[in-house]
Amino acid sequence: MDANECSNSENSATTTIPKSASPSTTISTKVVKLDEIGILISQGAEAKTYETDLYGLKCIVKERFSKAYRHPILDQKISSKRILQEVRSLNKCKKKGIQVPSLYLVDIGNNRIYMEFIKGETVKHYLYKNQESTQHQNQIESIMKELGNQIGIIHEMNVIHGDLTTSNMLLRESTNELVFIDFGLSYTSNSVEDKAVDLYVLERAFISTHPNSEQLFQTILSNYELTSSNSKIVIQKLNQVRLRGRKKTCFG
């Protein structure tokens, strides 16, 4: 599903009906307020995320909200551009075999993306529970290896996630598959610097939320090298980014 195919005009929405959905069940994406039909599950700086129902199927709706300080026309253009970029990133990953939420509907007029509801826990929560458990070490190592492999493939497509943290990775309950979520800050770039910064964001997330996780991140990097053709250059640049980060921490 190309981004242009799933975008809509201000007064309509293009729908992809999930196979398991009931065709007799409908909702109006034009008039429905999500806080009336859905459950707010998170709110960030750019968007709110709801759990709701689409054609009888549980789904997640991500709704970008307007910024009062921006001119309405400019605000809509920026929101539309970011939504379409997120959709493109998800589609690229899906076509390459990366586990990401399936897209159901994109409603540009209302700044919404309807996507697959994934039942599972975040990698962050999994590590909180099991990092110190000896019986889970093999599983944790397997997850870290998969993380490195998948990020390498994502970067090989020149997709920059923009917010690589263990909160934005899920373990699907039914299969334990690793699923990447929240591509709201993603963009396309072949820059070694951008890829290195993407990895640095993940490293800082490990340092700040998962104590004694240095070896875990090293496992990620080792497996990143297996799927990224320019991994050596990216990791060299990562070392430079780390140095800049330390200087900023020391001197402000």
Curated annotation (Swiss-Prot):
Residues 1-23 are annotated as: Disordered. NCBIfam families: arch_bud32. PANTHER family: EKC_KEOPS COMPLEX SUBUNIT TP53RK, NON-SPECIFIC SERINE/THREONINE PROTEIN KINASE. It comes from Dictyostelium discoideum (Social amoeba). Component of the EKC/KEOPS complex that is required for the formation of a threonylcarbamoyl group on adenosine at position 37 (t(6)A37) in tRNAs that read codons beginning with adenine. The complex is probably involved in the transfer of the threonylcarbamoyl moiety of threonylcarbamoyl-AMP (TC-AMP) to the N6 group of A37. Bud32 has ATPase activity in the context of the EKC/KEOPS complex and likely plays a supporting role to the catalytic subunit osgep. Keywords: ATP-binding, Hydrolase, Kinase, Nucleotide-binding, Nucleus, Phosphoprotein, Serine/threonine-protein kinase, Transferase, tRNA processing. One of its GO terms (biological process) is protein phosphorylation. Residues 35-252 form the Protein kinase domain. Belongs to the protein kinase superfamily. BUD32 family. This is EKC/KEOPS complex subunit bud32.
